[in-house]
């Protein structure tokens, strides 16, 4: 597998000495399914948003094989990087009043200028959106309003929207946080299938150890904005799990 992204000594601060991410280094490979594992507040969401250029790091670098250094990119390079980097959000980030199909079509906007995007999108985009909906098992809901879907179905719409971007990387921020166990398995299985069949790198943040072990090729454990472990999922030890959640347990006790 080829290296897709290289992150070196990355730090993100929201004020003096208030680091959400601190001195993080790791790489992502094509077609790799990686889980960012850690409790709430560990810095996982901030890290994901920095990889997509939505949050600016205060130090360090993010190097893309296709777009160079992200933090130093021109507006055009950054726009292309974001098009190649799809996001799947915890709260779906869908427009409830629009149809499922229209929400999925928004994943194609990065391929058009602002003025062109104000017009109806080409039929070829519509066909891509329908194909994505068929793949996530929602073709029969294409004309339904998003607000009428269950939480699990809405998350599948979010994944279909990511698919039509034709990305090289999918970043999924706690995509199963509000779902029941059955729906959680469906969503993670779908992301894993996309990763394996399409050779798209997937980086997903989770706090559930059992799901991380079940689905990840590699687990990057985070606590207090730092990487605690970075290794194959089968090699994650109980002592490392304890280290990931220790500060939360200590806070609960006190």
From Swiss-Prot:
Chain's role: Part of the ABC transporter complex PhnCDE involved in phosphonates import. Responsible for energy coupling to the transport system.
Protein name (Swiss-Prot/TrEMBL): Phosphonates import ATP-binding protein PhnC
Signal peptide annotation: none
Catalyses which reaction(s): phosphonate(out) + ATP + H2O = phosphonate(in) + ADP + phosphate + H(+)
Domain ABC transporter: 5-249
UniProt keywords, alphabetically: ATP-binding, Cell inner membrane, Cell membrane, Membrane, Nucleotide-binding, Phosphonate transport, Translocase, Transport
GO CC field: plasma membrane
Molecular-function GO terms, alphabetical: ABC-type phosphonate transporter activity; ATP binding; ATP hydrolysis activity
Protein family according to the UniProt entry: Belongs to the ABC transporter superfamily. Phosphonates importer (TC 3.A.1.9.1) family.
Subunit and partners: The complex is composed of two ATP-binding proteins (PhnC), two transmembrane proteins (PhnE) and a solute-binding protein (PhnD).
Topology term for the membrane: Peripheral membrane protein
Pfam families tied to this protein: ABC_tran
EC number: 7.3.2.2
Superkingdom assignment: Bacteria
Protein residues bound to ATP: 38-45
Keyword Ribonucleoprotein in annotation: no
Cellular compartment(s): Cell inner membrane
């Amino acid at each position: 597998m080829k290296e897709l992204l290289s992150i070196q000594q990355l730090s993100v601060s929201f004020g003096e000495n208030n680091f959400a991410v601190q001195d993080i280094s790791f790489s992502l490979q094509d077609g790799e399914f990686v889980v960012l594992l850690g409790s709430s507040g560990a810095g996982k969401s901030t890290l994901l948003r920095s990889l997509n250029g939505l949050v600016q790091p205060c130090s360090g670098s993010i190097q893309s094989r296709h777009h160079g250094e992200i933090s130093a990119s021109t507006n055009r390079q950054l726009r292309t990087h974001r098009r190649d980097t799809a996001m799947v959000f915890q709260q779906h980030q869908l427009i409830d009043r629009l149809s499922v199909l229209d929400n999925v079509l928004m994943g194609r906007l990065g391929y058009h200028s602002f003025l062109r995007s104000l017009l109806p999108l080409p039929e070829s985009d519509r066909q891509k959106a329908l194909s994505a909906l068929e793949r996530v098992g929602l073709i029969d809901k294409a004309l339904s309003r998003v607000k009428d879907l269950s939480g699990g179905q809405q998350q599948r719409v979010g994944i279909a929207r990511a698919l039509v971007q034709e990305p090289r990387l999918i970043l999924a921020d706690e995509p199963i946080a509000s779902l029941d166990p059955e729906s959680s398995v469906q969503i993670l299985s779908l992301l894993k299938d996309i990763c394996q069949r399409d050779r798209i790198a997937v980086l997903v943040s989770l706090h559930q150890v059992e799901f991380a072990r079940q689905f990840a090729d590699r687990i990057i454990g985070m606590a207090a904005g730092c990487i605690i472990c970075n290794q194959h999922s089968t090699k994650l030890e109980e002592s490392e799990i304890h280290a990931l959640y220790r500060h939360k347990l200590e806070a609960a006790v006190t």
